[in-house]
Amino acid sequence: MSKLGKFFKGTRSSRARAAPSAQEALARLRETEEMLAKKQEYLENRIQRELALAKKHGSQNKRAALQALKRKKRFEKQLTQVDGTLSTIEFQREALENSHTNTEVLRNMGFAAKAMKAVHDNMDLNKIDDLMQDITEQQDIAQEISEAFSQRVQFADGFDEAELLAELEELEQEELNKKMTSLELPNVPSSSLPAQPSRKASMPSSVHRSRAASSRRAEEDDDFKQLAAWAT
């Protein structure tokens, strides 16, 4: 085995024996990102400087202009490599962050599951069923009590309500009959009618009697109307 292979094998073995924590690995990856970002900024500035030199010596010193363009190309190649490395580092950091998040979520879920199990260990399904049955029975009893209070109280007096209603109607009818009997009717004249005079002389007296009879009939009609209205 070559020395290089032994070196990497020993490195892998040492890492396996002492694996870094997720926080430590993330911290180192962020440091590497910062270093590569500074490298990018340096290379971009060098590229701009070499481009400016190439433009400056383009018409006066062609050899210096070509050397500036060569350096510019070399810096651009390095910048491309740094960009690729930085992308890989960012991807690795994001993957490690996701793995760390998933690990924390899984650990918290396991902790919650243990707590839930401890709670359920102190609970008996049979006791829960008995408790729910007791609650249902007490609710039914409370409902019956509420219905009993809301119903009308009826005393056992032994009287028939239909008979009482019939007796009440009889009393009302008797009272109505008494009121009708005590009602005063118009008096009928007891004197005999006068003898019929001769046709010629009795014309004014006949008209007078007709008017008196009409007045009595009107009074009688009024009395009967009042009686009928009272009776209804």
Curated annotation (Swiss-Prot):
Swiss-Prot/TrEMBL keywords: Coiled coil, Cytoplasm, Endosome, Membrane, Phosphoprotein, Protein transport, Transport
Coiled-coil blocks: 21-45, 125-185
Localization per record: Cytoplasm, Cytosol; Late endosome membrane; Midbody, Midbody ring
PTM sites of type Phosphoserine: S210
Sequence segments annotated as region (Intramolecular interaction with N-terminus): 154-232
Spans annotated as Intramolecular interaction with C-terminus: 1-153
Annotated membrane topology: Peripheral membrane protein
Free-text description of this protein's post-translational modifications in UniProt: Phosphorylated at Ser-210 by AURKB during cytokinesis: together with ZFYVE19/ANCHR, phosphorylated CHMP4C retains abscission-competent VPS4 (VPS4A and/or VPS4B) at the midbody ring until abscission checkpoint signaling is terminated at late cytokinesis.
Pfam families the record matches: Snf7
GO biological process: autophagosome maturation; autophagy; late endosome to lysosome transport; membrane fission; midbody abscission; mitotic cytokinesis checkpoint signaling; mitotic metaphase chromosome alignment; multivesicular body assembly
Region named Disordered: 1-23, 177-232
A GO CC term assigned to this protein in UniProt: kinetochore
GO MF entry, a single one: protein homodimerization activity
Keyword Cytoplasm: yes
Function: Probable core component of the endosomal sorting required for transport complex III (ESCRT-III) which is involved in multivesicular bodies (MVBs) formation and sorting of endosomal cargo proteins into MVBs. MVBs contain intraluminal vesicles (ILVs) that are generated by invagination and scission from the limiting membrane of the endosome and mostly are delivered to lysosomes enabling degradation of membrane proteins, such as stimulated growth factor receptors, lysosomal enzymes and lipids. The MVB pathway appears to require the sequential function of ESCRT-O, -I,-II and -III complexes.
Domains (record comment): The acidic C-terminus and the basic N-terminus are thought to render the protein in a closed, soluble and inactive conformation through an autoinhibitory intramolecular interaction. The open and active conformation, which enables membrane binding and oligomerization, is achieved by interaction with other cellular binding partners, probably including other ESCRT components.
Membership in a protein family: Belongs to the SNF7 family.
Subunit structure: Probable core component of the endosomal sorting required for transport complex III (ESCRT-III). ESCRT-III components are thought to multimerize to form a flat lattice on the perimeter membrane of the endosome. Several assembly forms of ESCRT-III may exist that interact and act sequentially. Self-associates. Interacts with CHMP2A. Interacts with CHMP4A. Interacts with CHMP4B. Interacts with CHMP6. Interacts with VPS4A. Interacts with PDCD6IP; the interaction is direct.
Protein's name according to its UniProt entry: Charged multivesicular body protein 4c
